[in-house]
Amino acid sequence: MHPAEHRDLDQRVRDASYVARVCDVIEQIESAVDSAEAVRLLKLATAQLGAEAAVFTSYVRDDITLASYRYLLACDPIWGLQYAQNGWCLDDPWLRYALYNAQPIRADQLPELSARERWVVEGAAHFGFASALIVPVPSPAAQSRVSVLCLGSSQPDYFAGDGCHRFNLMARGLAMELGDWMHRQVRNELMAEARITDDDLMLLRHQQQGHNSKVIASALNTEAKTIDCRFQRLSLKLGAANRRAALRVAEIYGLI
């Protein structure tokens, strides 16, 4: 990489207004009303940071067989199309890194990749990710729920300059705010689609504390068999086999 290209990013992050400009965009994410608004702010934040492209990925795994992926794309939409058509979510080395790590890392610092993982990275390089910074967003649900922000540049080694420490700090702030926003979206959607009530949440909290039906019934001044029936209905709402599985879904999606 030509030294002047490093200076472009180094000079940008040393600008006196750099942090304020980036933070101004980050602060707006909380009030984004939908994905379109979140994408608009991600594009703006990406530009203010000094990157060319960005992808934010949210991953939720309900159990061993069921997983869902959500994306905010601030890059060429053709990349998103190719990613989906090729099923690259199953071989994405950037997401794999985020599942087990919390520190930002440059893509070129990742351990040796498999052939399919290299295919994903080579595909991304054509759409503004010749170099990339991977910023994980950990969650209390560990590998069952994680997000990752990937920032890209068409210039190789773009994120290896002296100014990258401050860049990384701002990128982590952006990633965390996007993670909080996406978490609220997913939680609210499940609450609405499953028609979860405050009484349902109260049952789940009792289950979380290890209370059996008899203890819950005593606390709610009702019968144990009534509690059993309510848990059966709640489990059906959440697509869970039993109350323990229902609690797991609730914890993964942040209902309680």
What are these regions (language model features)?
Residues N212-A245:
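Recognition helix of helix-turn-helix DNA-binding domains
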